[in-house]
Amino acid sequence: MPSLKDVKVKIAGVKKTKQITKAMNMVASAKLRGAQQRIERFRPYAEKFYGMLGDLASKADGSAHPLLEVRDEIKTCGIVLATSDRGLCGSFNANLISTALKLAKQKAAEGKTVKFYCVGKKGRDTIRKADFEVVTAIADQMGSFDFQLANKLGLEVINHYLTGELDEVVLVYGEFVSTAKQLPITLPILPIASEKKDEAEAAPSKEYIYEPAVEGLLAELLPRFIKVQIYRGLLDTSASEHAARMAAMDNATRSCDDMIGALTLLFNKTRQASITRDLMDIVGGAEALKG
């Protein structure tokens, strides 16, 4: 049985850990509220943008712009992977990386070359260890970013697609559903023609008057569409990270409470055993004196 001092030290250590996990839970909760507000502010713009672009895409054929063209042969696949820079958020990063690696291995099995564009340290480090090529690695920005990050990454992906370095591009990110649910999402973003036309045909008919011509607008809006998709994925991933960390720290705090309870019980049992031994020594000594 451990000594009373050892048990006291363990209890003190667990209490300090509980203070840290509780503080991290509160910080994650505050950051989650901010991330949710950013998503709510951006969502109406994104939805209107998607609707208008879908209508535009339905009025043009694949030759209207290179980003609408579906290539006959897909040789190289680019995967844009968004993860967090920090850990302590449960299985959040592991699920995203697992989804990305599963996709990469599937593409590789089809004879395609796979190239990664990673945002976040966790994804970058794991993908490099998995021996896949990391073309771009952006770190230490998931905690605080704006549209410029998506703009920079989007421009690079678009340039590589237009020059033939990539034949298709897929975005892997964490969709924020609720504080208790975050899902790894695989979203093809290039080429965009087929999916946007399908959406436009399924949507209620709307009459738009476009000036200048459709082709001119597509040249301006299609690159921005890619950037908007990436930015929305980054916003969702950021909110999902904070929600996952909040849940992980809440579970850790509860585990600390359970451990403190178990250690306190052990402390009381140890102290009781010590008192019993002392009483037995006293009684034994008294009996010896009587004898």
From Swiss-Prot:
Domain of life, source organism: Bacteria
Keyword Nucleotide-binding: no
Xref: CDD domains: F1-ATPase_gamma (cd12151)
Topological category with respect to the lipid bilayer: Peripheral membrane protein
Molecular-function annotations in GO: ATP binding; proton-transporting ATP synthase activity, rotational mechanism
One GO BP annotation of this record: proton motive force-driven plasma membrane ATP synthesis
Principal localisation: membrane
SUPFAM superfamilies in alphabetical order: ATP synthase (F1-ATPase), gamma subunit
Entry keywords, A to Z: ATP synthesis, Cell inner membrane, Cell membrane, CF(1), Hydrogen ion transport, Ion transport, Membrane, Transport
GO cellular component: plasma membrane; proton-transporting ATP synthase complex
Subcellular compartments: Cell inner membrane
Subunit structure: F-type ATPases have 2 components, CF(1) - the catalytic core - and CF(0) - the membrane proton channel. CF(1) has five subunits: alpha(3), beta(3), gamma(1), delta(1), epsilon(1). CF(0) has three main subunits: a, b and c.
Family the UniProt entry places it in: Belongs to the ATPase gamma chain family.
Functional note: Produces ATP from ADP in the presence of a proton gradient across the membrane. The gamma chain is believed to be important in regulating ATPase activity and the flow of protons through the CF(0) complex.
Family matches, as PANTHER family: ATP SYNTHASE GAMMA CHAIN, ATP SYNTHASE SUBUNIT GAMMA, MITOCHONDRIAL
Official protein name in the record: ATP synthase gamma chain
Gene symbol of the encoding locus: atpG
